């Protein structure tokens, strides 16, 4: 694992004159290990600290430990409820302990988790709060909240507004020596570019250039992860690639990736988009004349396409299922899904406009 931040933390631990300060830095190091997916290393550190301070807890250290536990939960499974609980606890303790830097960092992570679950109202409040709490040199908090803002604008279809915030994310992450943040930037951009390419292909004329660019971004993200030793959420990268291959019409290449990695990806946090992934898997099977299996996957996609799914995933699922049913000669079902897709894409456009208004207000 290559990380300037890791080397800096190790040096700071060695130089710390105060034992509690050194242990807080060890907990911070565990946070970094969690973000790189090295969970055993992080848990070993935290277990030792918890045992050491069991009889005489320190609130600041407890806050760092809780943040690290939350990050282990988050990077083990995106959207895990335990992550929110642990990081909110760290936020509360750091506030009570009057540790503004840690408080700001926890607030930035809560904004990130709000984004993951698409609670944009809460996210906007956290964005405004973090920007007030974190000074310009608090690179950890500033890089995280800049990434939240960037990906929110990107999600809302306003890449021109996202770009300066992506640049700030890179600037703060580089200043911190934080390769995990730079890896997250590349990965999140790749997923959002893929989502936009998906919408272009399914609801518009289809833009081959956008799909090619999204594939380049996905490959860059995967290569950077390998370079710096990031192991977190490793099943998601091949599923991202499978989607792009399918969008490019390379169904014979996409299908093995789905078959090998889909179940694992669902356990790592992709379950919220199982509706779309099952529908796209069905489409790949249709194209390869696996009609019986395609029908089964289409039924699974319909069952997973609930009202609590993200709007863009619901719209994409209906669009893909319309194609699947049409290819299978089920024209009434195809027409129904086509109509539902049109309504869902319109609702998604409304959501995007609402999100832009929320984040604009948070930044004023």
Where are these regions (language model features)?
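C-terminal non-catalytic interaction modules
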Residues: 1-15, 20, 287-364
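Short juxta-domain linker segments that transition from a proline/glycine-rich
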Residues: 1-68, 75-84, 91, 97, ...
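Helix-turn-helix repeat elements of alpha-solenoid scaffolds
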Residues: 1-10, 35-48, 77-89, 116-129, ...
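Short coil/turn linkers that connect adjacent helices within long alpha-helical scaffolds
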Residues: 14-20, 54-58, 76-77, 93-99, ...
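Tandem amphipathic alpha-helical repeat scaffolds
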Residues: 24-38, 63-79, 102-119, 141-158, ...
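Solenoidal tandem-repeat scaffolds enriched in leucines and small polar residues
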Residues: 122-220
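Eukaryotic tandem repeat interaction scaffolds
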Residues: 210-307
């Amino acid at each position: 694992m290559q990380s300037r931040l890791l080397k800096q933390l190790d040096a700071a631990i060695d130089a710390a004159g105060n034992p509690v300060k050194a242990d807080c830095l060890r907990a911070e190091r565990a946070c970094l290990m969690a973000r790189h997916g090295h969970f055993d290393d992080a848990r070993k550190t935290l277990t030792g600290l918890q045992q050491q301070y069991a009889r005489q807890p320190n609130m600041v250290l407890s806050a760092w430990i809780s943040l690290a536990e939350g990050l282990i939960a988050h990077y083990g499974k995106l959207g895990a409820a335990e992550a929110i609980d642990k990081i909110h606890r760290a936020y509360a303790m750091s506030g009570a302990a009057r540790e503004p830097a840690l408080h700001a960092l926890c607030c930035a992570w809560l904004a990130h988790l709000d984004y993951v679950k698409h609670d944009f109202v809460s996210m906007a409040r956290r964005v405004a709060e973090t920007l007030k709490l974190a000074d310009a040199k608090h690179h950890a908090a500033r890089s995280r909240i800049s990434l939240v803002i960037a990906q929110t604008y990107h999600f809302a279809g306003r890449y021109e507004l996202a770009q300066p915030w992506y640049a700030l994310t890179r600037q703060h992450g580089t200043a911190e020596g934080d390769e995990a943040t730079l890896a997250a930037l590349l990965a999140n951009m790749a997923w959002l570019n893929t989502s936009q390419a998906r919408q272009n292909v399914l609801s518009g004329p289809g833009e081959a250039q956008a799909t090619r660019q999204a594939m380049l971004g996905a490959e860059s993200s995967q290569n950077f992860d390998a370079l710096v030793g990031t192991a977190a959420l490793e099943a998601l990268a091949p599923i991202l690639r499978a989607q792009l291959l399918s969008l490019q019409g390379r169904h014979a290449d996409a299908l093995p990736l789905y078959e090998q990695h889909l179940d694992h990806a669902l356990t790592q946090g992709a379950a919220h988009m199982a509706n779309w992934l099952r529908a796209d898997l069905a489409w790949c099977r249709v194209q390869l004349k696996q009609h019986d299996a395609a029908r089964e996957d289409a039924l699974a996609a319909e069952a997973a396409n609930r009202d609590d799914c993200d709007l863009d995933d619901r719209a994409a699922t209906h669009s893909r299922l319309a194609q699947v049913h049409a290819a299978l000669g089920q024209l009434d079902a195809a027409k129904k899904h086509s109509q539902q897709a049109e309504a869902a894409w319109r609702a998604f456009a409304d959501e995007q406009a609402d999100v832009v208004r929320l984040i604009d207000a948070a930044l004023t």
